[in-house]
Amino acid sequence: MSLLRHSLQALPLLCLCVLVLACIGACQSEAYEGTPSPPPEQKKSHWNLVQSRMKEFLEPAVTRTRDRWQWLWSLSALRGFMQTYYDDHLRDLGPRTKTWLLESKDSLLNKTYSLCPRLLCADKK
């Protein structure tokens, strides 16, 4: 019972980590969209390794799911609904998430600086 309670408590943190990794991957892919190959510093990055491992893990599942649900997607009414939903809610999800992450970071830094003693952080305000 205790193990189940701890795993349920860890679930939101795991979801947050997956969301952050997905956002980082989306931001990196948008930044290097026009370049033929990533720069050398990205090739050596640990984040690039995490991104490639996640892609290895998720790509087959996404492909299998897409193949299994292809019959449903072929229905024109559902396709129209899904396209409208995507256009209304999901098209700009990457930039919105990136903006939210930057605002959250700025807010956290401001709160941290407000708690910092003036002697140490006076020049950073």
UniProtKB/Swiss-Prot annotation:
Question: Does this entry carry the keyword Secreted?
Answer: yes
GO CC annotations? high-density lipoprotein particle; very-low-density lipoprotein particle
Annotated GO biological process: lipid transport; positive regulation of triglyceride storage; triglyceride homeostasis
Q: Does the keyword Signal apply?
A: yes
By its UniProt entry, which Pfam families does this protein fall under?
APOC4
Tell me which positions the record assigns to the signal sequence: 1-27
Q: Which PANTHER family match?
A: APOLIPOPROTEIN C-IV
Q: What family classification does the UniProt entry report for this protein?
A: Belongs to the apolipoprotein C4 family.
Q: What does this protein do?
A: May participate in lipoprotein metabolism.
What protein name applies here? Apolipoprotein C-IV
Q: State the species of origin.
A: Saimiri boliviensis boliviensis (Bolivian squirrel monkey)
